[in-house]
Curated annotation (Swiss-Prot):
ATP binds at L21, R22, G63, K66, T67, T68, E129, D130, F131, R172, Y182, R219. Keywords: ATP-binding, Cytoplasm, DNA damage, DNA recombination, DNA repair, DNA-binding, Hydrolase, Nucleotide-binding. InterPro entries: AAA+_ATPase, AAA_lid_4, DNA_helicase_Holl-junc_RuvB, P-loop_NTPase, RuvB-like_N, RuvB_C, WH-like_DNA-bd_sf, WH_DNA-bd_sf. It comes from Bacillus cereus (strain AH187). This is Holliday junction branch migration complex subunit RuvB.
């Protein structure tokens, strides 16, 4: 598990907190307006027809609210949600056990659905399309296939890597929603709401400062607030002020754009050793001592989002914006 303070991945300490902070309805849900408005229509239409909602695929960077939306979908439809993950379903029998336990209309939420094994996907296809399950009884020449009917259900899949899904699986989702990074104003609203739950006073400017450094991600915003709250209680009077916030985030090595020491290491490594690029991913991996898939999936998305890094056919290139951020001049060609 990624232990970075600024990781969008869920950490152990996040689980209970996220549950207590989780909105229960689309009306309470902040941000993701496009996805939210579309889901409102699809859910209302399904309820009017007294049908289950089409299968939903939620994709985008970690920490943006995919699990929260899955639970909201179940709440809005008035049904139960069963939660599992791609890595937890190791055999077709594991999936069969989950599917046969569902009640009519239930939501089955599979996180990290891109990590399902292909043999398990093949069991899932008829379940998604025809609400039935084909299982093999016996072994060898006496083995026979039996089809079991399943109650109608809605599969909600979540992934940070939509491109890693097989085309047959992706095509079976009727609703595809990409979750985008949040704006500073949206994150500030989330920070202030979280502070209310914590029963901590926070200045509006402090909430904005945390939001600016949260990399567009609610999970990171809430995590930063927890750490700043610690400083406010120990080094201040308990109120999260702008002064306390800036001091805390500086000590936590989170700069004004939400970059940490690993981001600095990656960008400065390319600048100082490869004159800003282009440089191949594997070379970057060897230079900073991180696995290439971790760089690609965890570190790079935000750097691409803010325009500090470019991916080109020839390799990674650090942009003029990054040089400006570090107070450095770009090398002359």
């Amino acid at each position: 598990m990624d232990e970075r303070l600024l990781s969008g991945e869920s950490a152990y300490e996040d689980a209970d907190l996220e549950y207590s902070l989780r909105p229960q309805t689309l009306r309470q849900y902040i941000g993701q307006d496009k996805a939210k408005h579309n889901l409102e229509v699809f859910i209302e239409a399904a309820k009017m027809r007294e049908e289950t909602l089409d299968h939903v695929l939620l994709y985008g960077p970690p920490g943006l609210g995919k699990t929260t939306l899955a639970n909201i979908i179940a709440n809005e439809m008035g049904v139960n949600v069963r939660t599992t993950s791609g890595p937890a379903i190791e055999r077709p029998g594991d999936l069969a056990a989950v599917l046969t336990s569902l009640q009519p209309g239930d939501v089955l939420f599979i996180d990290e659905i891109h990590r399902l094994h292909r043999s398990i996907e093949e069991v899932l296809y008829p379940a998604m399309e025809d609400f039935c399950l084909d299982i093999v009884i016996g072994k060898g020449p006496s083995a026979r296939s039996v089809r079991l009917d399943l109650p109608p259900f809605t599969l909600v899949g979540a992934t940070t890597r939509a491109g890693a899904l097989s085309a047959p699986l992706r095509d079976r989702f009727g609703v595809l929603s990409r979750l985008e990074y949040y704006t500073v104003d949206q994150l500030s609203e989330i920070v202030e709401r979280t502070a209310e739950v914590f029963e901590v006073e926070i200045d509006s400017l402090a909430a904005l400062e945390i939001a600016r450094r949260a990399r567009g991600t609610p999970r990171i915003a809430n995590r930063l607030l927890r750490r700043v709250r610690d400083f406010a209680q120990v080094r201040g009077n308990g109120t999260v002020t702008m002064e306390i916030t800036q001091m805390a985030l500086e000590l936590l090595q989170v700069d004004k754009l939400g970059l940490d020491h690993i981001d600095h290491k990656l960008l400065l490594g390319i600048i100082e050793k490869f004159r800003g690029g282009p440089v191949g991913l594997e070379t970057v991996s060897a230079t900073i001592g991180e696995e290439s898939h971790t760089i690609e999936d965890v570190y790079e998305p935000y750097l691409l989002q803010i325009g500090f890094l470019q991916r080109t056919p020839r390799g990674r290139i650090v942009t003029p914006l990054a040089y400006e951020h570090f107070g450095m001049e770009m090398p002359k060609v």
